[in-house]
């Protein structure tokens, strides 16, 4: 959904994310990229923002919008596009792994496998 076109949906999603059992929110957005920051305003959960290359600026506008959040409304920002999407998933897994042994073991195995080449 769009933070600009459907702000009521953003509020609803953010306010109730934790009670629905979510541990981390991943939000992708292009252009003005308000979605990650708007969600962060409505939840205490970690929010990871993925800037998308949706305009002539190839995602630089979205990168700045997500990375330049004001103090007190943090959003973790990953790379633009598909690499960012992958890293957002890995970052979310590492956060959830702090309190979930099964995910911790799987994530550790994934990282060990990466190091092996």
Spans of features found by a protein language model:
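Short beta->alpha junction loops
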Residues: 1-7
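Cofactor-binding loop segments of dinucleotide-utilizing enzymes, especially the Rossmann-like FAD-
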Residues: 2, 52, 80
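Short alpha-helical
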Residues: 5, 33-34, 83
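Short, well-ordered secondary-structure micro-motifs
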Residues: 8-13, 36-39, 60-62, 87-88
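Glycine-rich phosphate-binding loop
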Residues: 13-55
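C-terminal binding/interaction regions
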Residues: 58-117
């Amino acid at each position: 959904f769009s933070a600009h076109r459907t702000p009521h949906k953003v509020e609803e999603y953010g306010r109730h994310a934790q009670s629905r059992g979510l541990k981390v929110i991943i939000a992708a957005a292009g252009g003005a990229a308000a979605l990650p920051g708007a969600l962060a305003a409505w939840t205490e959960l970690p929010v990871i923002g993925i800037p998308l290359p949706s305009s002539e600026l190839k995602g630089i506008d979205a990168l700045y919008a997500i990375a330049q959040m004001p103090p007190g409304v943090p959003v973790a920002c990953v790379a633009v596009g598909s690499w960012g999407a992958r890293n957002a998933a890995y970052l979310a897994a590492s956060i959830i792994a702090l309190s979930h042994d099964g995910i911790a073991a799987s994530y550790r195995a994934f990282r060990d496998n990466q190091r092996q080449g």
